[in-house]
Design a protein with these regions (language model features):
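N-terminal active-site segment of His-dependent metallophosphoesterases
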Residues: 17-74, 204-206
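Active-site-proximal segments of metal-dependent phosphoesterases and phosphodiesterases across multiple
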Residues: 179-238
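Active-site neighborhood of phospho(di)ester-bond hydrolases with catalytic His/Asp-centered motifs
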Residues: 28-30, 58-65, 91-98, 160, ...
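Active-site environment of divalent metal-dependent phosphoester hydrolases
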Residues: 35-37, 68-71, 96-105, 141-142, ...
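A short C-terminal boundary segment appended to hydrolase-like catalytic domains
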Residues: 279-332
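Extended active-site neighborhood of metal-dependent phosphoesterases/phosphodiesterases
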Residues: 72-170, 177-179, 251-269, 285-288, ...
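Conserved beta-sheet core of the metallophosphoesterase superfamily
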Residues: 211, 217-293
């Protein structure tokens, strides 16, 4: 009963407050793919809520699998909805998951082809945003980063596609190294498994199992363990990783120490059809991650604008305490 009262109070406080100077709040949109397949009105309720509460949000992070079948009609609808986030001036980090990649619709990462994603979310549109940081691949959004000022600090949110290559991880490292005064957040589709370990060669749904792993022009993809080893663990200013992709429980949480002593807060959240207990494509659940500088906490809540309630499971509502924000950057 106390938990329910807390969550109801948190909802009122979030909706009524504007983005505070001493905290940074990011909304994470987990895999949205089966909303387009079954019930786009549920996804629309998420966008409605984000737009309504945009003054309390510093950025929106969509973790990939925006579409289910990589079909033009899905991309058209996705763009029509997502530009509403643009319309209120909110920074948006997009990600390309395995369902957003392929030689044609209904092919899931059989080859590395993101033409449809780049047709409906063209670089010419995304790079015109004031928060745009840069991109790796000429004329494409596949690997990019955005720059967000929140909580009195600067954040670089780096988006790397499903199974990033060594080249993409090296580029991400260059972004982190060239911005030592910025907190780094990684947005990538496949990173954690549902047992809260890094996706590796033993797990289902690992990037190296997909056909595009044999695309010689693309290069070999990395699973979660490769992403950790080659990028996340090496840079002092990396503070968080958000991902989706994995089914079963669709949830995982891990805190890891990088080689420079910084703690990295890593979170998997997925509610799509196929996840245990999923209804209506995911019932509209999204994540709200708030970094509280004053109390040294990272607070995570999971809310459904469609159901108008918080998730009942403690696995989806929790607080990381004693976050040493001074241990990441040269920013004071």
């Amino acid at each position: 009963m106390k938990t329910l009262a807390y969550l109801l109070l948190a909802a009122v406080c979030f909706i009524s407050a504007s983005a505070a100077e001493n905290e940074a709040t990011f909304v994470i949109l987990p895999d949205t793919q089966t909303y387009f397949e079954q019930c786009p009105e549920v996804f629309e309720s998420q966008i409605d809520w984000i737009v309504k509460n945009h003054d309390s949000i510093d950025a929106v992070i969509q973790v990939g699998d925006l579409t289910q079948e990589n079909y033009p009609a899905e991309w058209y609808l996705a763009h029509r909805m997502m530009v509403r986030i643009d319309s209120v001036g909110l920074p948006l980090s997009l990600n390309l998951g395995n369902h957003d990649i392929g030689s044609r619709p209904f092919k899931y990462s059989d080859t590395y082809n993101t033409d449809l994603a780049n047709r409906y979310f063209p670089l010419s549109e995304r790079s015109g945003k004031p928060y745009w940081g840069g991109n790796l691949h000429e004329g494409r959004i596949d690997a990019h980063y955005i720059s967000v000022d929140a909580g009195g600090a600067n954040w670089k949110i780096i988006s790397l596609p499903f199974g990033p290559t060594d080249r993409e991880l090296e580029w991400a490292g260059q972004i982190a190294d060239s911005h030592p005064d910025s907190y780094i957040v990684l947005n990538t589709h496949a990173y954690l498994y549902c047992d809260s370990t890094l996706i590796d060669g033993k797990d289902y749904w690992k990037p190296t199992d997909y056909g595009y792993a044999n695309d010689s022009l693309r290069g070999c993809p990395n699973n979660g363990d490769g992403i950790w080893e080659k990028f996340v663990s090496r840079h002092r200013n990396v503070i968080a990783v958000f991902c989706g992709h994995v089914l079963k429980s669709g949830v995982g949480t891990r805190v890891s120490k990088g080689v420079n002593g910084n703690m990295v807060y890593e979170m998997l959240a997925n509610f799509q059809r196929g996840v245990e207990g999923s209804k209506m494509g995911g019932e509209g659940y999204l994540r709200i991650a708030t970094f509280h500088f004053d109390t040294k906490e990272l607070e995570v809540k999971t809310y459904s604008p469609w159901l108008k309630r918080y998730h009942a499971s403690p696995a989806h509502n929790f607080i990381f305490k004693n976050v040493d924000f001074t241990n990441y950057t040269t920013h004071e």
